[in-house]
């Protein structure tokens, strides 16, 4: 009975968090997560390049429209994300990993926000 309850709870958590219920909820390591999952991944690691649309050196966040435009710089990192059971992982490609429970996510934005340059019209 407890196993059934926990299974149902897990499915509900995936729906609330916007994670798919595909085969075990797994996602192989990728730098291009499914479009429907960007809201989840980009909330907890907003400096990933796949979260931004850049043109002519100015970038707009694909998910959070209230984010200011930024200048494309070292703030944006090439991330790979993966999910195995309830473990969500961000890899920044330089040996830095951020691992968290998918159902209890913890943002990992602070170290990168120090490098973010907000676009000002005078920057042109």
From Swiss-Prot:
Signal as UniProt keyword: yes
GO cellular component labels? host cell endoplasmic reticulum-Golgi intermediate compartment; virion component
Q: What Pfam families does this protein's entry cite? A: v110 (PF01639)
Give the UniProt keywords, A-Z: Early protein, Glycoprotein, Signal, Virion
Q: Where is this motif: Prevents secretion from ER?
A: 121-124
Please state where this protein is localized: Virion; Host endoplasmic reticulum-Golgi intermediate compartment
**Sites carrying sugar chains:** 64
Q: Induction: what does the entry report? A: Expressed in the early phase of the viral replicative cycle.
Query: Where is the signal peptide, in residue numbers?
Result: 1-18
Q: Say where the protein is mainly found.
A: virion
> What function does the entry list?
Causes the redistribution of lumenal ER protein to an enlarged ERGIC compartment.
Family assignment from sequence similarity: Belongs to the asfivirus MGF 110 family.
Its recorded name reads Protein MGF 110-4L
């Amino acid at each position: 009975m407890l196993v059934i309850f926990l299974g149902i709870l897990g499915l509900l958590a995936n729906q609330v968090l916007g994670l798919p219920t595909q085969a075990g909820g797994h996602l192989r390591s990728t730098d291009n997560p499914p479009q429907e999952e960007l809201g989840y991944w980009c909330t907890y690691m907003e400096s990933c390049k796949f979260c931004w649309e850049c043109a002519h050196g100015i970038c707009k966040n694909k998910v959070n429209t209230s984010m200011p435009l930024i200048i494309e710089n070292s703030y944006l990192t090439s991330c790979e994300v993966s999910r195995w059971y309830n473990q969500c992982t961000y890899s920044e490609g330089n040996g830095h990993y951020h691992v968290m429970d998918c159902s209890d996510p913890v943002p990992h934005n602070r170290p990168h926000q120090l490098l973010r340059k907000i676009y000002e019209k005078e920057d042109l």
